[in-house]
Structure formats: structure tokens, C-alpha cells
Design a protein with these regions (language model features):
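Helicase motor core with emphasis on the C-terminal RecA-like subdomain
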Residues: 3-12, 16, 20, 24-36, ...
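Conserved catalytic helix of short-chain dehydrogenase/reductases
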Residues: 68
């Protein structure tokens, strides 16, 4: 493991070492390899690309599907003293120019944006003239027709290899079948990417299936017996209100 990566981990995140599944991902990124990594939710995927970006020169471009996710990561990075920007919402031309000027001058270490931004010629032109370290496709399963969370806008990411042929591409996901994995590699044009799979087992979660006649009576017994936090899914808002009473 790169010694500077460990220093950055300790300084900004307060940890002494990486999780076992994180180390090979970070090593691959630091070596400049195209990488596809699969880690469970809560497995520390963001750290896998954030730490190497702090080691490398340039701005890390992150494509993400959700505004809330981008804003949350930018806030967390800012609280750690790390400069990050998310291009969200309808930004006036002059304001977008100002922000992109700052990006081009490397005022930010991380630039987050939705895939739709890649359709903006103003943004794309500036990106091509910005010293980027590598490109991260977060929630990469959204690019696949075979995935349940397919987003057509993610298909814009297919052109990233054409636009930035020398930049490493890092695809991250918490869930991907073999077919979706193949789709990700093909569509992002990273067929020789290093593929790293962490265990998707969640030891803190337990799943059980019951066949019951009176579901509300059984639910009451389960909740009474289980003293820990519980989540109950129902079909509509009316049922949530009835259940809460």
C-alpha cells in the first residue's frame, strides 16, 4: 500500500488501515488501471476512489446519479478540509463559467456531476482542458439495460473513453449480476479492467420468510419479541399510517 495513502487515510478519515477489500481497489487505481469494483452498501466504496485522488495530481471527476448523494459526499469531504464541488440544478451560464474556471485551475480536488451534464458542450469543453486524474462512475449498474436501476442518461458515459482515451476509468457498484458486470465493462469500453469483488454478505442483517394467515397478528408478535430497530414495508401510505397507530 502506498504510504501516502495511509497518511491521508489517518489525517482526513482517522483510520489506521484500510479494510481488506479496499486495498486492492486503491492499489489498482494508484497504478492507473481501469477498475471495476463491487462492494456492499456501507463497504466504503467512496473511500476507495477518494483516497487515491488525494495521492494523485489533478481533479477527480465523479459521475453520480443522485443529487442527494453528490451533495452528501461534497459535504463530508468539505468537513474533512477537502475541496469538492457538485454541479447540480439549473446553473446560469455565467455562474457555471465561474465554477468551471475554478475547476480548470484545480481549485477543487473532486468534481461531481450527473451524467446529463456530459451533454453540455460548455461543461465538456472545460473538462477536456482540465487536468483530470481519473474518472469515477458511481452506481455503475445504472448503465446496464439488464439492471433494475437502468438510467438512459448513464449511456452518455459510453463516450468517456472516446473523449478521454488516456484517463483511467473506475466503475463502482454495490450490486451487479454477471450479465450487468459484462455490460458495464463493454459499455464503458474497459474490457481489460481489473475486476475486484468484495463479499456482499451483510453479517449484521438477517432475512427470514414466513407463510402466515394473519400478517398483522404475526407482525405484532415479531415486533414485540424483537427489541432492536426494525423496518416494515407496506404497499401504500394509508397502510403505514394504520400500522403506526
Amino acid at each position: 500500500m502506498h504510504p501516502l495513502a495511509l497518511e491521508i487515510l489517518k489525517k482526513h478519515w482517522g483510520y489506521d488501515q484500510f479494510r481488506p477489500a479496499q486495498e486492492p481497489i486503491i492499489d489498482a487505481i494508484l497504478q492507473g488501471k481501469d477498475t471495476m469494483a463491487m462492494l456492499p452498501t456501507g463497504g466504503g466504496k467512496s473511500l476507495c476512489f477518494q483516497v487515491p485522488a488525494m495521492v494523485k495530481e489533478g481533479v477527480c471527476l465523479v459521475i453520480s446519479p443522485l443529487i442527494s448523494l453528490m451533495e452528501d459526499q461534497v459535504r463530508n469531504l468539505s468537513e474533512k478540509g477537502i475541496s469538492a464541488l457538485a454541479l447540480t440544478g439549473n446553473i446560469p451560464f455565467y455562474e457555471l463559467e465561474r465554477l468551471l474556471n475554478n475547476v480548470q485551475s484545480e481549485a477543487y480536488k473532486f468534481l461531481y456531476m450527473a451524467p446529463e451534464r456530459l451533454n453540455n458542450e460548455q461543461v465538456l469543453y472545460r473538462l477536456k482542458h482540465t487536468p483530470l486524474s481519473y474518472i469515477v462512475i458511481d452506481e455503475a449498474h445504472c448503465i446496464s439495460h439488464w439492471g433494475k436501476d437502468f438510467r438512459p442518461s448513464y449511456l452518455e458515459c459510453k463516450r468517456l473513453r472516446e473523449w478521454f482515451p488516456s484517463l483511467p476509468i473506475v466503475a463502482l457498484t454495490a450490486t451487479a449480476t454477471d450479465r450487468v458486470q459484462e455490460d458495464i465493462l463493454q459499455l464503458l469500453q474497459i474490457p481489460k479492467a481489473i475486476v475486484i469483488k468484495g463479499s456482499l454478505a451483510r453479517p449484521t442483517l438477517a432475512y427470514m420468510t414466513y407463510y402466515i394467515e394473519d400478517k398483522w397478528e404475526r407482525l405484532g408478535r415479531i415486533l414485540t419479541k424483537n427489541k432492536e430497530s426494525s423496518i416494515v414495508y407496506v404497499r401504500n401510505r394509508r397502510l403505514t399510517e394504520e400500522l403506526a397507530q
